[in-house]
């Protein structure tokens, strides 16, 4: 028996997720969503494409919580405000599947080999979060945009490139199970990369 379930004191069910992300501009997100729909048909995938407004590159996952931890939000916002980097170009030119839970493999748009701007932002933000005591152990950073989840796994293959200038990053509050994102903060990158 787990101590957390002893005497009816079960762990609260997570309802809220916090993460930092880069989101493509609306026109690029529309094109990515269109590609997801086309590839879903061509590759005979059954998973439902992610909503256009949810397409993003995760930089740092802060965790899943039962309720919104305001102290963590405040600390994360302060750490993000200390990031000082120029804007940069992001390029995504392949699709493929990651390993996931059985029957639920992420089918993703993958960053080009020269994703140094995203890696730099990931590293800089990670250092600020660590300095604030908010660092989490995370897997290696692989820039990607999740298009859908599916039982099939697809080998990496090239697609027509998607490019945009990354001018900001955001802190997102995801309401788990409700397919709802709330942007809690935006931090601009300096112009003229």
Locate the predicted segments by residue:
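Histidine-dependent nucleotide/RNA phosphoesterase domain, centered on the 2H-phosphoesterase fold
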Residues: 1-193
């Amino acid at each position: 028996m787990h101590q957390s379930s002893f005497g009816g004191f079960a762990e609260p069910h997570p309802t809220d997720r916090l993460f930092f992300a880069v989101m493509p501009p609306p026109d690029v997100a529309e094109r990515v969503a269109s590609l997801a729909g086309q590839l879903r048909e061509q590759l005979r995938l059954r998973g439902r494409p992610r909503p256009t407004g949810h397409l993003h590159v995760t930089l740092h996952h802060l965790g899943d919580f039962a309720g919104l931890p305001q102290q963590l939000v405040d600390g994360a916002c302060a750490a993000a405000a200390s990031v000082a980097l120029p804007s940069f170009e992001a390029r995504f030119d392949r699709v493929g599947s990651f390993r996931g839970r059985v029957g639920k493999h992420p089918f993703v748009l993958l960053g080009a080999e020269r994703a140094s701007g995203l890696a730099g932002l990931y590293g800089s933000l990670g250092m600020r979060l660590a300095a604030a005591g908010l660092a989490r152990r995370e897997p290696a950073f692989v820039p990607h945009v999740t298009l859908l989840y599916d039982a099939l796994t697809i080998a990496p293959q090239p697609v027509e490139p998607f490019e945009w200038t990354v001018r900001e990053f955001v802190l997102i509050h995801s309401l788990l199970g409700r397919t709802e994102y709330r942007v809690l903060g935006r931090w601009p990158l300096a112009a003229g990369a």
